[in-house]
């Protein structure tokens, strides 16, 4: 059995983030074999992770890796925004997106599998649930990206143009979050729904007006709706006098696609009861 030195305990602590006593116990159990101790602690972390797996992870970060021709965008969730700002979480996210890009992954499942051991170590260290939620790989003639505070990520592909233009348009998408690329993509159902909403909201204004006037009013609202909902018709955030579609055309480019990720989109967050939370903390303190 190898001697359990202070240096060995320190190394294990630095590599796992566990407490000094836990590291010493793990090394003793592993006979001084640090790699076996890490494996044992991972197994212990897996138990902790299983307990945390039911906790909703709705915070986190978006990460992007690109080279101008291809990009990978991922979302990694944590339970708290505080953890999302910590170095250990950031390192896990960075390693995950690097892996996804290097392996040219197009589905999140292989990334989840590849990063599971590291995830378990992280969960065991930080004490809250962490999940790799989604991934998308995008390739194109020109690919530009924009990341806003690690909370919103956008990838834009162009035919023609250059990366800087694609990045500018990606920044616009991050700010405006369009639903569609072109007006033609807006469904007839969505237009009809918008029309009905307009008529209901303006019932008093249109009452008694000729049908042709009402039709013009509705047409104006639908035109505005299409401009607001489709990227190419939106006013460019850096120059509102120019539409995004015209900006691309002027540069000899065509917008092919955009991808928008926002942390927590579609995740139902639990509503915390502050009184219950305090009571639970007091009960735990008495144990």
Swiss-Prot record:
UniProt cross-references to PROSITE patterns, sorted A to Z: EF_TS_1, EF_TS_2
Record-linked CDD domains = UBA_EF-Ts
Which SUPFAM superfamilies does this UniProt record tie to the protein? Answer: Elongation factor Ts (EF-Ts), dimerisation domain, UBA-like
- Gene Ontology cellular component terms for the protein in this record: cytoplasm
Record localization: Cytoplasm
Q: Does the keyword Protein biosynthesis apply?
A: yes
InterPro entries noted in UniProt: EF-Ts_dimer_sf (IPR036402), Transl_elong_EFTs/EF1B (IPR001816), Transl_elong_EFTs/EF1B_dimer (IPR014039), Transl_elong_Ts_CS (IPR018101), UBA-like_sf (IPR009060)
Which protein are we looking at?
Answer: Elongation factor Ts
Where do the record's region annotations for Involved in Mg(2+) ion dislocation from EF-Tu lie? 80-83
A Gene Ontology molecular-function term?
Answer: translation elongation factor activity
Say which species the protein is native to. Answer: Pseudomonas savastanoi pv. phaseolicola (strain 1448A / Race 6) (Pseudomonas syringae pv. phaseolicola (strain 1448A / Race 6))
- Record keywords: Cytoplasm, Elongation factor, Protein biosynthesis
């Amino acid at each position: 059995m190898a001697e359990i030195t202070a240096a060995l305990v320190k190394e294990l602590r630095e590599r796992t983030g566990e407490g000094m006593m836990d590291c010493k116990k793990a090394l003793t159990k592993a006979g001084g074999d640090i790699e076996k101790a890490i494996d044992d602690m991972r197994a212990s972390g897996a138990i902790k992770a299983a307990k945390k797996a039911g906790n909703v992870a709705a915070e986190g970060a978006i990460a992007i890796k690109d080279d101008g021709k291809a990009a990978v965008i991922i979302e990694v969730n944590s339970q708290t925004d505080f953890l999302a700002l910590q170095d250990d979480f950031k390192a896990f996210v960075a390693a995950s997106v690097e892996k996804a890009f290097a392996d040219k992954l197009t589905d999140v499942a292989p990334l989840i599998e590849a990063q599971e051991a590291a995830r378990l170590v992280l969960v065991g260290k930080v004490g809250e649930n962490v999940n790799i939620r989604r991934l998308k790989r995008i390739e194109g003639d020109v690919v530009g990206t924009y990341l806003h505070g690690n909370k919103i990520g956008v990838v834009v592909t162009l035919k023609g143009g250059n990366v800087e233009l694609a990045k500018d348009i990606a920044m616009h998408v991050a700010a405006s979050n369009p639903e569609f690329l072109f007006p033609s993509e807006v469904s007839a159902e969505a237009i009809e729904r918008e029309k009905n909403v307009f008529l209901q909201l303006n019932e008093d204004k249109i009452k008694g007006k000729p049908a042709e006037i009402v039709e013009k009013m509705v047409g104006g609202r639908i035109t505005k709706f299409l401009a607001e909902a489709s990227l190419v018709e939106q006013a460019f955030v850096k120059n509102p006098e120019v539409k995004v579609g015209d900006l691309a055309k002027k540069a000899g480019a065509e917008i092919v696609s955009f991808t928008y990720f926002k942390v927590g989109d579609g995740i139902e967050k639990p509503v915390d009861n502050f009184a219950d939370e305090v009571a639970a903390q007091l009960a735990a303190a008495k144990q």
